[in-house]
């Protein structure tokens, strides 16, 4: 099944303006998001602020919206943590792979093969779920992967 993966628009962390947990979009990121379009049956969205705001500021239309931590970013940098999380505990590659397997299991339980699906997520998650078959996505970049 071909699935669309969208990396969030430019965040404050991406622009090197700050190092804070669960950071917001920049003005440029809001502009990038406003250029995004598409029509999807179902959208899976990471619960991180930058992915939610990317979807909020976009012109993407959808039927069902599912928020899940299963497609959030690999916890490495300060921005990859929610406010209540300990940023000294990083996620390993093996832990990310296990989370991807859990996401795929959950994903397949929610969709049917004929549906047009979008996953709004993050650089490392998208790169890993695509098995590194494409370059890591840039901010607000859409990639299509076979799931």
Residue ranges: model-predicted function:
Residues 1-2, 28, 67, 71-87, ...:
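Acidic, low-complexity terminal tails and accessory targeting/binding regions
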Residues 52, 56, 126-131:
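Short, hydrophobic alpha-helix immediately C-terminal to the catalytic nucleophile
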Residues 29, 33, 100, 104, ...:
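Short amphipathic alpha-helical/adjacent loop interface patches that line ligand
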């Amino acid at each position: 099944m071909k699935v669309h993966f969208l990396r969030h628009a430019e965040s404050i962390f991406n622009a090197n303006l700050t190092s804070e947990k669960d950071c917001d979009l920049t003005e440029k990121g809001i502009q990038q998001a406003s250029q995004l379009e598409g029509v999807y049956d179902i959208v899976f969205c990471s619960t991180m602020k930058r992915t939610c705001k990317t979807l909020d500021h976009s012109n993407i239309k959808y039927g069902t919206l599912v928020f899940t931590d299963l497609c959030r970013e690999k916890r490495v940098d300060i921005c990859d943590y929610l406010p209540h999380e300990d940023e000294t505990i990083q996620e390993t590659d093996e832990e990310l792979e296990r989370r991807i397997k859990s996401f795929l299991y959950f994903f397949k339980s929610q969709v049917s093969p004929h549906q047009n699906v979008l996953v709004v997520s993050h650089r490392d998650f998208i790169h890993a779920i695509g098995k590194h078959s494409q370059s890591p996505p840039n901010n607000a970049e859409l990639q299509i992967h076979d799931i």
